[in-house]
């Protein structure tokens, strides 16, 4: 079922999606702070590897207790570059740790989320990576501009 098919399910489905997204954002902020602290006891790449290893253990545990689908099915994905998500994740972990250490959690997360928003919208506009292409909407452009202005205001002393 595609993204647009799921949207038609109604308000409850969207509300659950909103709730999950809010939890995700909160967990990402907490994880970034935790990872930055772990780095202080070791090194950034050791901390990043530990983070990825613990994520692997949790994912295997969740797989064992839930769906038990064939793990080799993941290799059927096309195009194959989609399998680079884990490698990208390693660099995400690294850049989150570095930015939180250098800027502090609030500034770093604000910039990270704004960058995510802008890149995600560009992906939708251009239909990259198999995402359904969306038309330009002024209100979304203005929303991104407001986010950027928010960064300037937040940083302003």
Set out the residue ranges of the language-model regions.
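Structural motif at transmembrane-helix junctions in multi-pass transporters
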Residues: 40-44, 95-114
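C-terminal transmembrane-helix exit sites in multi-pass transporters
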Residues: 118-138
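Small-residue-rich packing faces within the transmembrane alpha-helices of Major Facilitator Superfamily
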Residues: 56-57, 118, 148
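Hydrophobic/aromatic residues within transmembrane alpha-helices
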Residues: 47, 99, 126-128
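Hydrophobic/small/kink-forming positions within alpha-helical transmembrane segments
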Residues: 29, 60, 90, 114-122
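Membrane-interface interhelical linkers
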Residues: 2-23, 40, 56-81, 132-138, ...
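Hydrophobic transmembrane alpha-helices of multi-pass small-molecule transport proteins
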Residues: 136-155
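Glycine-/small-residue-enriched transmembrane alpha-helix faces in small-molecule transporters
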Residues: 6-41, 45, 91, 95, ...
